[in-house]
Amino acid sequence: MAKVDIDIVDFEYIEEIIRNRYPELSITSIHDDPNYCNXXIVIEGPLEDLTRFMANEYCDGMDSEDAEFYMGLIEQ
């Protein structure tokens, strides 16, 4: 199992994407920050599925340096 701790802006959107496209993954922790318009979540699941989610959904449209950084947050 792998996991990643990321910041998101639209929790409902990410939750729906995971539920519909990556059912093997689960959101195991949610932390809303009242001072900012974002939430931090922990997603866990098989490494291959988590890597695919990060590459195709979370990092989509990022510069290569940014995508590389966020892909590096995946823990095994």
Curated annotation (Swiss-Prot):
Pfam family, one: Phage_FRD3
Record's protein name: Uncharacterized 8.8 kDa protein in frd-Gp32 intergenic region
Matches recorded under InterPro entries: Phage_T4_Frd3
Top-rank lineage group of the source organism: Viruses
